[in-house]
């Protein structure tokens, strides 16, 4: 596809204008300079041609791929692997985690208070134990998820030592795999770091449980380092800011090391690290049906290597409908704060939320981010725990007005969404509503919100990969109904 005549005339006039200005000052284009202008013209022409071609091909793709929505009902398709009553389609069994938010009675979904269970233990009990003993609890949760039992003091100490040994990245990894190929998106950088780890593993294709466990423990340990270094590279090469590469300390917890690595002075308080540790515990596992954990099961069922399976899970978690939702909450709250003059005025806040739900404000999708969940109905226990902890930190930092704004969003949104949609579905705040606010109060940059989710969830992913290898046995192969008619092939000269 050639450059249009109008575009060519513009380029010619531009060239003549520049040449005329230079002639006026006694300067003329050299043959080499004229050649450069011609090359530039060709490059612009190629870019325009490519853009027009892509637009044309996109139009063809859009016109050929739509599917009549009525066909999903006709063929009883479980879209999103959901049943008509909102429950999930049963595709597997797991003993790792459970997400409880409803019961099914007489075929109907009945709302009940939310519970999050790790290997049979309520996550609230795990958090309470860590707080009572003034200890970091994420590492104990990782042990529990991997091995199905609570560790003794000696077992936990051995496990922490093992994690500490692996926190440092392999020799030359930082220089070759992070600094030489920085990324504007930390989740993409994390996925690449996971895949690159394959090349530094002497036995990457060994699928024995002992080797897979060794690989998973190394990844659990290194995720915080990979994320922090990816962030530092972004600061240097994309943000034009100073880059600080600190060594992780083996004696520190995951939360402590992460705060140490992202801050230029390596400083953090115990309260900051304990609050981040709480967030890591709450995000470590969420059953086998969430998108990224299911991805681990699906990809692992194909008998691929650990790095490919975990890298795929990182890609899933990055999605705006999954782990990326916490950033969307933060952006929505920015919009609310900009457009609501009086944050303490309930009527004004409620009115603006109604505009968002009615597609009249913010991004006009009608979604109030941080509200609603596939399983939780009355409450998301993770959101409840984070909300209570956020209250204390907000008081300490003088951010009570902003905290109360978040609470109003939680309080008003269920009624607003019910009135808008009227489908009878109970809606509660999910963990994303408060997680970003907590991270921002810890002075954690927004681009690290979703990577923090991954730093936590790698423990659950690892447990699900091992479970799939031990108990899976079959490759995932669900059915897709083809709805296109057969056609007679047409030779190219007759099309």
Placement of each model-derived feature along the sequence:
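Non-transmembrane, aqueous-exposed alpha-helical and coiled segments at domain scale
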Residues: 2-495
């Amino acid at each position: 596809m050639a450059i249009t005549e109008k575009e060519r005339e513009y380029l010619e006039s531009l060239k003549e204008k520049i040449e005329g200005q230079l002639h006026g000052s006694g300067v003329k284009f050299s043959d080499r300079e004229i050649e450069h202008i011609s090359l530039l013209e060709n490059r612009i022409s190629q870019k325009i041609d490519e853009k027009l071609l892509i637009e044309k091909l996109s139009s063809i793709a859009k016109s050929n791929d739509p599917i009549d929505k009525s066909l999903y009902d006709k063929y009883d398709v479980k879209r999103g692997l959901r049943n008509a009553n909102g429950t999930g389609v049963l595709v597997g069994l797991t003993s790792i985690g459970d997400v409880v938010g409803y019961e099914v009675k007489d075929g109907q979904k009945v709302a009940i208070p939310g519970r999050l269970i790790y290997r049979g233990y309520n996550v609230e009990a795990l958090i309470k134990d860590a707080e009572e003993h003034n200890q970091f609890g994420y590492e104990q949760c990782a042990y529990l998820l991997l091995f199905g039992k609570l560790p003794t003091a000696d077992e936990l100490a051995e496990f922490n030592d093992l994690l500490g040994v692996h926190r440092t990245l392999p020799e030359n990894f930082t220089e070759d795999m992070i600094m030489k190929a920085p990324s504007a998106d930390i989740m993409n950088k994390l996925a690449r770091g996971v895949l690159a780890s394959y090349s530094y593993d002497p036995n990457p294709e060994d699928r024995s449980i002992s080797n897979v466990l060794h690989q998973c423990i190394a990844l659990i340990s290194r995720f915080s380092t990979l994320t922090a270094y990816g962030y530092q590279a972004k600061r240097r090469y994309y943000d034009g800011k100073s880059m600080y590469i600190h060594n992780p300390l083996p004696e520190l917890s995951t939360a402590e090391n992460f705060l140490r690595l992202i801050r230029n002075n390596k400083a953090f308080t115990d309260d900051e690290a304990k609050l981040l540790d709480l967030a890591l515990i709450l995000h470590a596992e969420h059953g086998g049906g969430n998108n990224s954990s299911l991805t681990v099961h699906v990809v692992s069922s194909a008998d691929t290597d650990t790095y490919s399976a975990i890298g795929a899970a990182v890609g899933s978690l990055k999605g705006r409908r999954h782990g990326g939702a916490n950033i969307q909450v933060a952006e929505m709250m920015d919009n609310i704060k900009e457009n609501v003059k009086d944050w303490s005025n309930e009527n004004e806040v409620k009115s603006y939320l109604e505009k968002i739900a009615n597609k009249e404000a913010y991004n006009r999708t009608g979604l109030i981010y941080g509200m609603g969940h596939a399983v939780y109905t009355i409450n998301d226990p993770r959101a409840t725990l984070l909300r209570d902890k956020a209250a204390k930190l907000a008081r300490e930092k003088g951010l009570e007005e902003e905290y109360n704004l978040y609470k109003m969003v939680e309080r008003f949104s269920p009624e607003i969404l019910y009135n808008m949609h009227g489908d009878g579905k109970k809606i509660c705040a999910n963990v994303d509503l408060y997680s970003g606010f907590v991270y921002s109060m810890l002075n954690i940059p927004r681009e690290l919100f979703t990577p923090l989710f991954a730093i936590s969830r790698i423990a659950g992913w690892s447990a699900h990969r091992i479970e799939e290898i031990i108990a899976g046995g079959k490759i995932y192969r669900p059915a897709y109904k083809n709805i296109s008619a057969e056609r007679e092939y047409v030779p190219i000269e007759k099309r």
